[in-house]
C-alpha cells in the first residue's frame, strides 16, 4: 500500500483516479480548491482537504508521500483567455510549491501535462498552454537539478461519467 496525494482530486479526472487508487488499497489524500469539481461523489475512504497547492508545506509539514499525482491546475483552454489571473495563480505561481513539497516528501511526482502545448508547435496558443509548457520545462530542469523522480502524462479528449459541462 502506498501513501498517495492527488491534487485536483475532486475534478473530473482526479475523482476517477481517487476512486481507483482507494479501490486498489492505497492511502489517498486529496487536495482541491473546488474551483472546477466533478459531480463524482467523494470517496469516503480518502482524506479531502479544501485548499490551494501553495499551502501544501504548511498543511503537511510532518507528512511524506510515496506519490503525488498533480492534476490540480486550471484546465480550460478557451476560458483561460478570460481568466488570466486564475491561470497564472493555479498553474504557474503554485507549481514551485508542488515541486518543493514533492522533493521534501521524497515522492515521485506524476504531472499532468497538456496536449495543447503542442498546438501549432508553440506553447503560446493560449495562457493555459503557455503555463503548461512552462511547468513541463521547469519540472524537467528541477528534476535534473534536485534529483526529483517524475513522470509526465498527457490526456487527450477525456470524457465519461460525472463530466462537468463547464469543462
Please provide the spans of the model-predicted regions.
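N-terminal Rossmann-like NAD(P)+-binding domain of SDR-like oxidoreductases, especially those catalyzing
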Residues: 1-158
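Short beta-loop-alpha junction of Rossmann-like oxidoreductase domains
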Residues: 121, 161-167
Amino acid at each position: 500500500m502506498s501513501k498517495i496525494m492527488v491534487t485536483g482530486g475532486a475534478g473530473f479526472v482526479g475523482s476517477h483516479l481517487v476512486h481507483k487508487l482507494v479501490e486498489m488499497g492505497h492511502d489517498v489524500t486529496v487536495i482541491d480548491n473546488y474551483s472546477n469539481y466533478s459531480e463524482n461523489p467523494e470517496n469516503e475512504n480518502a482524506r479531502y482537504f479544501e485548499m490551494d497547492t501553495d499551502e501544501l508545506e504548511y498543511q503537511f509539514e510532518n507528512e511524506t508521500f510515496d506519490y503525488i499525482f498533480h492534476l490540480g491546475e486550471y484546465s480550460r483552454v478557451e476560458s483561460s483567455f478570460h481568466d488570466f489571473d486564475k491561470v497564472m495563480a493555479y498553474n504557474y505561481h503554485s507549481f514551485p510549491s508542488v515541486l518543493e513539497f514533492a522533493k521534501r516528501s521524497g515522492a515521485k511526482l506524476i504531472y499532468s501535462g497538456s496536449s495543447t502545448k503542442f498546438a501549432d508547435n508553440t506553447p503560446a496558443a493560449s495562457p493555459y498552454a503557455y503555463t503548461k509548457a512552462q511547468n513541463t520545462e521547469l519540472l524537467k530542469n528541477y528534476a535534473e537539478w534536485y534529483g526529483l523522480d517524475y513522470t509526465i502524462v498527457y490526456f487527450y479528449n477525456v470524457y465519461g461519467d460525472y463530466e462537468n459541462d463547464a469543462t
